Amino acid sequence: LILAITMGWIDVANISAIMFTGLGLLLTINITSGLFHIGFYDELTQIGNRRALLAAAKTAGNQYSLAMIDADHFKKINDRFGHDLGDQALRVIASCISKVGCGAKAFRYGGEEFCLLFKGKSQAEVTDCLEQLRQAIANYDMVIRDKKARPAQCAKGEKNRGASRRHSNLRLTVSVGVVDSSAGGSFEQLIKLADRALYRAKAGGRNRLAFA
């Protein structure tokens, strides 16, 4: 429409130039915004992706905590119920971790693994928030029903829990590995330490926190 109007006024140089400039700016803004979203946000969960995490790490400062979070028995969920429900489970977890508080920023690290970055916080300062998150996910009964009827939001799922017994329920849990910058090393090294703590949590029975 803008282009059509512009072409209609092509004989008026000033107006035509202004309209072409406006169209160019709008297209540039839309393309840039779209590319940024594709580059830094996870398509499935709509939270930051690994690239966004690494960008955030550059401004994390000298004091921060990391939590690596992994969905327990996720392969079994996919194998038993299919990838559609597996994707829904990831959206539920992403919704929950994006509301964790304590100033955290949530990211999908890859697969069923997520990361929380707490700038300016020590490990001790984020433990309660992470324990509340673990409990919130463990208390969330994901109702297995028709795909269109499934709630994608953590809070809505908790509200609806127990409303109907005609459907089977899936209990989600996560294991969490925690480290803070006092452990020393680069950001990538701290991620590895948090990952090791995460797998200790899994080895210890899952659905728990472990610390580096």
Where are these regions (language model features)?
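Active-site-proximal alpha-helical element of nucleotidyl cyclase-like catalytic domains
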Residues: 85-105, 113, 132, 139
